[in-house]
Amino acid sequence: GFVRQAGRKEETVTITTLQEFDPEQVDMFTVVLIGNSQSYYREGKLITPRGYYREKTTDATGIGQEIMINSFRTIEKELKNKNIPSDHKWALLHAIHTTADFEMENILHIDPLAVECLYKILNEGKVRTIITDVTMAAAGIRKGALERMGIGVKCYLGDERAAALAKEKGITRTQAGIRMAAEEHPEALYVFGNAPTALMELCDLIRKEKAHPCGIIAAPVGFVHVCESKHMVKPFSHIPKLIVEGRKGGS
């Protein structure tokens, strides 16, 4: 990139590539900024990370972080909407990174201030338990972050009591699991990555004031009751929510 008349009223900034660069645009009043292979473009700025770039690293954690960072950069470059608010973008990047599905840009519904609110209560230690509908959703939550924040994750799907309750009441096991979870952890953060009947059960419990979730992540997937369950959870405006709309979702 290059800056003409830097610091003056006539200042102009141009971001370009070596292939498209026109030397005729540069004169004695121009400052030229040269990036490297790690430089990237974001919000009208050319950003080059500080430090020395290593082609290879033997640290497993470093390799994983490097892959994630490069993945996020790739995703951000391919987003159609370049003016997404930072809190929405943070959640969207993770959703696309997990699914490799850029339709998330259109179907990920985020309540106003939901990400900010959830981030705040998580970091303030106000969330002690996360409830998931299935074990796969529980397995996908980073263990290191949970340990650092002192948060426990519970899934009642494999609980014998849930199986017995499901048989007795004629409901699904995930539905029974959420019913049990609401009795023991009514104010938990509830995460759904598979079962629409479980999300519908939570909605029913909220209406009956038997559950008071501090937040809801609603991403059940499939063809039966999926869209209906997501429509049911939307009206609870007092609860911060992230919803993958339509049939898509997943743990």
Task: Tell me the role of every PLM-derived stretch.
Residues 2, 130-132, 155, 191-192, ...:
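General beta-strand structural signal in soluble alpha/beta enzymes
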Residues 26-29, 125-128, 148-152, 184-188, ...:
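Short coil/turn connectors at secondary-structure junctions
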Residues 59-128:
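Electropositive, gly/pro-rich neighborhoods at or near active sites that engage anionic ligands
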Residues 220-251:
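A structural signal for small-residue-enriched, beta-sheet-centric alpha/beta enzyme cores
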